[in-house]
Amino acid sequence: MYKNEMTWRIRVYGIVQGVGFRPTVSRHATNHGIYGTVCNKGPYVEIYAQGTKEQIDGFLNSLKEHPPKRAAVLKINTEDITADTTEQFEQFDIIESEKTKGEIFISQDIAICDECKAEMFDPKDRRYLHPFINCTCCGPRLTILDALPYDRERTSMKEFPMCPDCAKEYTDEKTRRYDAQPVCCNQCGPQVYLIGRPERGRAAITYTRRLIREGKIVAIKGIGGFHLCCDATNEEVVCRLRTLKNRPAKPFAVMAKDESVVKRECVVTPEQEAILTGHQKPILLLDRRSDGGLASSVAPNNPKVGVMLPYAPVQLLIFQYDDGIEMPDLLVMTSGNTSGAPICREDEEAVAELSHLCDAMLSHNRKIRIRADDTVMDFYRNEPYMIRRSRGYAPLPFMTKADWKGQVLAVGGELKNTFCIGVDNRFYPSPYVGDLEDLRTVKALQETIHRFQTLLEVKPQAVVCDLHPKYNSTVVAEELGYPVIRVQHHYAHILSCMTENDCHDPVIGVAFDGTGYGTDGTIWGGEILLADYGNFTRFGSITPFLQMGGDASAKEGWRIAVSMIYGYTKDRKRAWEIMETLGLCSEQESRVQFTMADRKINAVASTSAGRLFDAVSAILGIRRRSGFEGEASTALQFAAEAYEQQNLSNISQEQKENKDILLHETKERFVLNTQMLVQQITEAKMRGEDTGMLAYRFHQVLAEMITAACIKAKESSGRDKVALSGGVFQNRLLLRLTEERLLQEGFEVLRHRMIPPNDGGIAIGQAAYGMYQLQK
């Protein structure tokens, strides 16, 4: 070793696999005259750097200031080992990956980068129109991964040996594909083909484009599974897809050719554009323009539409190719599955599940190891507000400052299922799995849990599930063979909000959603909790009502409306007069509901805030039934928002209600007087007052009730932090009105940002509870 030379061992932790980290290290080392090695150890990248103190300092500074675009460096540990080594390095080398134990971070799938896009459409480039073009900065990661460290032989690309040209790029540090594990080209990479037809490669893409142009439906395999695709400007084919999918009203996601098309169709803020065009490319819920070209049946009676940009090369090629076919610049791109089932990822699944839904299926022979549905994101206060966290975001971990040790698996909720693995203070939420009412989704959950345990090298000390004894998620947890910890649904919601915000103080939790199994065996869903990681107390709830008719009541808000009206009138004749005036149901239907209520037939006590919204939507004549989850409550929100927008100058934020009538106290808990609110809304509607105004008033008074309950909880407990969670808080109007009032009253408000407030986010709360229990 030369005089003044030092040798340092440097370990870099974070998302440093599958993002071109080692090639970047090598380039920085060369630029600063550093000799040594870089090696992928799995949990971290290890660097041996030899040079003068000035050279090493410059190298480290470059590494910190200019990491790869997609990397997330969480920490860098350095150690001067000059006194412990006599090794003299002659150059700087990337050496073969080695497996070691430690913190593991897995890269998410990354949308095609601008450089690859430019190459793909350059006729002079050897990857011209290549459907699987990628580089160190972009391409599939999680969805092709078999095991760590992230190297080609541990991905589904191991089946495609590199050609000499690709191998040359792979080993040349001057190229963008230096050490890019999925690197391939038209000669050596995967191929696209039509299932059940002879066309492959270019012919298959041209055939697909022609069908779509002619108004047909095609299933297309992407990065995380199949999509069903058709012309989003063609009313006839969109209606046909709705009929085939048995999806009468739920909005379809749309893929636009580029951001200029999105701006033509939707209102896009600069902050939204940054997410839309970024490397994760979620579906963004955007406000539609009235003069857009989308078929009305894409998102019926909805002021918003979910839009994304192409993130896989093959999707770009559907829009643009050299075959002379003029394509629409907007395509429906909805998950390739039948109702209730997980997204299809294999040809056999697609043939079985999608054949009757489409006219052709464009697939490819790069295997998908883990399904990844598209991420869905809204915006609130000009910030991302996650609705479904999946492709591009999972499995990026959430880290807390808690000094927790252990390993847990949380299986998540029954609906919108995701699971979460906790390792010490790190929590890895899975991609979206789906609703576990379907046994195919249960199987997908079991498969994905097994693969995640393998990738993260985890053997849980406990598995955490919901309290409900008959949920399929509970059965999955029990069958895994680990000790089972059960946690109440709404408590898990609040813990998920606390964990995302890294809050370790006791909080007042407001959990508003559609349903959850309560500790008393009734249906909960409009809850005020006093919570910390160790336990919770039910401090308050909305007014209980009878939820009659089982599953039907979740889809038919008129049933809940009848129950509530009968509940406060306590008189069949008067109740029927109101129902008849409002057109809620037939006289025969009302008699059945009255009898069920009187005799408690198929009737369960409920405090579901979701059903409260459905009932008010029915009473106001907005939606009496929901064709999909949340349709009635979302329509109520849209009516209220439209009224607010049109009457901004006339709306007073000052609340006139006497605080004493917003709440009343029972021997069990405080009760938000939502029965009184429903009665007031009903009577006002019968007087002919404006529907939009009443929809807004409902939101306004409910926010005031929540605030009053939190004030009582603060007086009782001394807590001044409020956590807002549950699917009802996807309603941005209620969230804003509630947050504003709480802030006015001096509360610190915790809310979700990158974890969904709905059931897709509760697994991280379950995992945090389980981890806390392990510390005892």
What residue ranges belong to the model's regions?
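A contiguous, well-structured pocket-lining segment that forms one wall/lid of small-molecule binding clefts
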Residues: 182, 189-190, 413-451, 563-720, ...
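A phosphate-binding glycine/aspartate-rich beta-alpha loop in the early core of alpha/beta enzymes
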Residues: 80, 163, 225-288
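Conserved phosphate-binding catalytic cores of ATP/NTP-utilizing and phosphoryl-transfer enzymes
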Residues: 263-268, 317, 343-348, 374-375, ...
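Glycine-rich phosphate-binding/hydrolytic loop that grips phosphoryl groups
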Residues: 491-512, 516-518, 557-566, 750-776
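Intrinsically disordered, low-complexity, mixed-charge
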Residues: 1-182, 186, 193
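Conserved phosphate-binding/catalytic loops in two-lobed NTP-binding clefts
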Residues: 466, 481-493, 720-723, 732, ...
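Internal gly/pro-rich beta-alpha loop/helix module
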Residues: 66, 169, 323, 327-402, ...
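Short glycine-rich phosphate-binding loop at a beta-alpha junction
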Residues: 219, 457-469, 717-728
